[in-house]
Amino acid sequence: MKLKKFFAGVVAAAMMLTMGATAAFATELEPVESKTVAVNNNTVTVQKIYKLDGQGISPEETFNFTVSDAEVTNAGTNVNKNALPVPTIGSAKYEATVEGGATTAGNTKKITIDFNKDGSLIYTGVGIYTYRVAETAGKTLGVAYDTKTYTMKVTVVNGDTVGSYKIHSVSFTDNATKQKDDAPSFTNTYTANTLSVSKTVDGALGDKDYPFEFTVNFAKNTENAEKTWTDAITAEKTDANNSKSTVNITSDSASFTLKHGESIKFSNVPAGLTYTVSETAVNDYETKINGNKTATAAVNGKVTTSADTDKDEEIVTYKNIKGIETPDTGVILDNAPYIALLAIVAFGGVALILNKRRRDEE
């Protein structure tokens, strides 16, 4: 009986020791997060996605990132909390080409965060290290920079040998949503499109072979005054026979002529510009811009329209009308039948009056 009680006591003591050891281990090492990124040779990667909204080719640009605001919890005694190690982060370079720049589907690159320095792990003690990872906003016109900030948590534990350390896990939390993210990414968008200007001549006296003079100017609008612009706009003119030719753009402007049925298209116009289209007025022509009637233009004047660019295609139509205002003769041929009819009626009336008078005299 005493022996049974002794064994029962031993079993109970063993269970208590096991539970205590389990609890102690649990507090000593935090389990791996359900959402972590893969660690390869003490490095992790995040994604950079560059998208195109509209039509155009994004300018060459290198996107940079920062790792900052280092903090640590559960730090070992040999960790200097006033000089915490900070990993390095790479950059993403995009070319000014169709395939090497922003694309509609999104051009994706890998950004490496490196926890090594001179071939060794930067950490010299255990702890849970946290950082803020963000993109450095640039100033390229037409580019929307990602303002997202991630909190990166790096859990460092004892290594396989005394005095060595290793990364147990790396996880990211989106600071905006407070959600864990196992595929952190930064997305930028380049927005650009086209501007088209066309010419139509109408009216009985409209000269369809006359070359109307135009000037188009581009300038950064007030909201984007601090942005930089690479001036990569191109222009192509199409005549009435669908033949195409290049139009030079200098100093943010282009001068050209358009006849009836001709047009010009400016490509790769970034969002954030203000364009101004001006036509040199020709005497006696009424001008309509995008179907809206304007006053008859005076000689040497300008007929102008302007707007800001965005992701949508801009289309400007100029229609010049010159009709007959005052007849050159006293007779309008279109009224001749009615005049002849009135003459016949008048002649008949006179004949009746004369015939009646003759009868009365008899």
Model-derived segments and spans:
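Solvent-exposed loop/turn and edge beta-strand elements of beta-rich ligand-binding domains
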Residues: K2-E362
